[in-house]
Amino acid sequence: RFYSSSFRTDRGNVAIFSGFPGQPNMSIMKQTNKAAKLPGLPLVLKNEGYMTRFTYGGDSNFTNTRAYMYSCGFEEVVDETGMNLEGHRSKWGYADDIVLDFAADEIIKRIKAEDKPVFDAILTLSSHEPFEVPYERLKTPLLNSFAFTDEQIGRFVEKLRATEEWENMLVILVPD
């Protein structure tokens, strides 16, 4: 069995980072006065000395994501406007191969440059409709996009695993 914290990404992110269940009729992320009062795992980690960053290859202003991520404790929010990358894009933003390569490079760079622990969260988007990915493995666009994201996450983990820092890393994958 698989369980999801919500049926929408904005609600799933709040469940993941603040422990607040996804609401069926509204998104607390869009209600800044309420969202600002929620606890945040990134804030707890920041207070313990972690550098915190949220990376998304799309527009972080969509559904008020940027404001929520800052309010729950991320020190830095990187989205498509701050990446200056080239490559395949869907209507939502950069494809997962581009974003995960960027994120892996940034994580490795930060770990090597700083003497502090790092907490990075990355939101993928290639498995979102309209399921347009630079990849042709399966017949249906939906399953093909899942296979693409799966392969890119594998590449991301392998890139991190190839570093000396791997022994001190923990990679957690969660659905929204």
Spell out what each predicted region is:
Residues 1-176:
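Solvent-exposed soluble domains appended to multi-pass membrane proteins
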